[in-house]
Amino acid sequence: MTKFIFVTGGVVSSLGKGITAASLGRLLKSRGLKVAIQKFDPYINVDPGTMSPYQHGEVFVTDDGAETDLDLGHYERFIDINLTKNSNVTTGKVYWAVISKERRGDYLGGTVQVIPHITNEIKERILRVAKESNPDVVITEIGGTVGDIESLPFLEAIRQLKNDVGKDNVLYIHVTLVPTLRVTGELKTKPTQHSVKELRSIGIQPDIIVARSEQPLSREITEKIALFCDIDKNAVIQAVDASNIYEVPLKLKEEGLDDIVIKKLGLTCGEPDLSEWEQIVERYKNPKFEVTIGIVGKYVSLPDAYLSVAEALRHAGIYHETRVNIRWIDSEMLEKEPVEKYLSNLDGILVPGGFGDRGVEGKIKAIQYARENKVPYLGLCLGMQTAVIEFARNVAGLKDANSSEFKPDGPHSVIDLLPEQKEVEQLGGTMRLGLYPCKLVPGTKAHAAYGEEIIYERHRHRYEFNNEYRELLTGLGLVISGTSPDGRLVEIIELSDHPWFVATQFHPEFKSRPNRPHPLFREFIGASLKTNKLF
């Protein structure tokens, strides 16, 4: 029988529920259990695909093309599994499904209500994940904060599910904040007490409380939380701020979180093997070398917009025993000031994905600097498209070269809309999304990195390399090192006369893992080390 673990949050948002859920998943997997995981987001958007990165952060893309919450990236990286569209459910998706059923007549003329129709749909989404892979444990994170009106249907659904599947098969974990009063240095438990009171008023009694704090909890504080929240003392898990997120599973293991979960759910499993994870943390905390990578983007004031990119760089750093210092560079500043001011002392330059023309000229200047000064360069999605534009302008002499996204009537659209996108009017969920094969050319840097001829990578784009310019640009030194298997779509480009200049139409950052860095990020950091005199 599959067991169900629900992770809720209280007091404030952004407490780290996602990291807590991912860390627990890692601990349970290390014991030999099969783990599935999902997140419920209470917003009414169907998915985050059309949301501003400033509002939501990164959009994480799964193999099957779902545009999802960035926490799914944490889940995949920590647990080392590939998730699906069923792993991220929003209020918008739930209501869309229920209204579609009502329009089809599935409810036989009945009045459609939050209870039971919305809550039943939510429960069905939870059980669907259990049926999909038949795991030992399903971990479900409930987004938002207890007390938010948007979260109420989800909380009611997980309350009901305990009766549906049996109380011995469900466990509730509540992540909360124990703040410190700076004036006195005193830890305060009242916010936690009120948060649990709110949760209990809905009918949910937490089995475990994960208490986030800046400093360790004293025995008195732990006992006070246990008393007022009516849980066992050993079920109060302190989660003191860690120096990096990869330490969190080890910290929670020290607190005995997985032992309590195993005991309360009656799971049969072995002892955890965290040796590989311990090695990852050790290499992360004690690097031998150091590089500085500039990420040139338009959303750099919110680094979460490029979360998977930053983590993929760190994974490559772990592999090379190298501290990767990330310098966030606003591409608009490169349009106003000399690029040398921002780029002259970098070991590598990366231009990530994005949409719209704001800051694009700054990205093109950064790419020109990397090309002319032989600085290692990695371009992702828009970072490939702008690399093609830069090459067309400054090497091929097509001064008006551009993308039809930015200049629809330009004379040289070296980047153009995919043919199948030209009749698309609706923005949401209509891009080229998900996992696609790519055929690599032997003898190229891309082929050397992967060591394979056919690879599979995740995409999220509408625009592509315009094949009308393929012969001209390749004749001047642009190398097309990866294409779709039929050769029609250009997926990877390189420069033949550069130490390491590679750009991809896909998003390799989504497939990187701390124990298995993505080949392109691994080689990019390796090339950046060679430009660093400390190596």
From Swiss-Prot:
CTP binds at S13, D148, I149, E150, K188, T189, K190, P191, T192, Q193, K224. CDD domains: CTPS_N, GATase1_CTP_Synthase. Keywords: ATP-binding, Glutamine amidotransferase, Ligase, Magnesium, Metal-binding, Nucleotide-binding, Pyrimidine biosynthesis. GO terms for cellular component: cytosol. The active site is at C381 (nucleophile), H507, E509. UTP binds at S13, K188, T189, K190, P191, T192, Q193, K224. Mg(2+) binds at D71, E141. Residues 1-267 are annotated as: Amidoligase domain. GO terms for biological process: 'de novo' CTP biosynthetic process; pyrimidine nucleobase biosynthetic process. Its EC number is 6.3.4.2. Allosterically activated by GTP, when glutamine is the substrate; GTP has no effect on the reaction when ammonia is the substrate. The allosteric effector GTP functions by stabilizing the protein conformation that binds the tetrahedral intermediate(s) formed during glutamine hydrolysis. Inhibited by the product CTP, via allosteric rather than competitive inhibition. Residues 292-534 form the Glutamine amidotransferase type-1 domain. InterPro entries: Class_I_gatase-like, CTP_synthase, CTP_synthase_N, GATASE, GATase1_CTP_Synthase, P-loop_NTPase. GO terms for molecular function: ATP binding; CTP synthase activity; glutaminase activity; identical protein binding; metal ion binding. L-glutamine binds at Y54, G354, L382, G383, M384, Q385, E405, R462. It catalyses: UTP + L-glutamine + ATP + H2O = CTP + L-glutamate + ADP + phosphate + 2 H(+); L-glutamine + H2O = L-glutamate + NH4(+); UTP + NH4(+) + ATP = CTP + ADP + phosphate + 2 H(+). ATP binds at S14, L15, G16, K17, G18, I19, D71. Pathway: Pyrimidine metabolism; CTP biosynthesis via de novo pathway; CTP from UDP: step 2/2. Disulfide bonds: none annotated. Homotetramer. CTPSs have evolved a hybrid strategy for distinguishing between UTP and CTP. The overlapping regions of the product feedback inhibitory and substrate sites recognize a common feature in both compounds, the triphosphate moiety. To differentiate isosteric substrate and product pyrimidine rings, an additional pocket far from the expected kinase/ligase catalytic site, specifically recognizes the cytosine and ribose portions of the product inhibitor. Catalyzes the ATP-dependent amination of UTP to CTP with either L-glutamine or ammonia as the source of nitrogen. Regulates intracellular CTP levels through interactions with the four ribonucleotide triphosphates. Belongs to the CTP synthase family. This is CTP synthase. It comes from Carboxydothermus hydrogenoformans (strain ATCC BAA-161 / DSM 6008 / Z-2901). The lineage of its organism: Bacteria, Bacillati, Bacillota, Clostridia, Thermoanaerobacterales. The gene is pyrG.
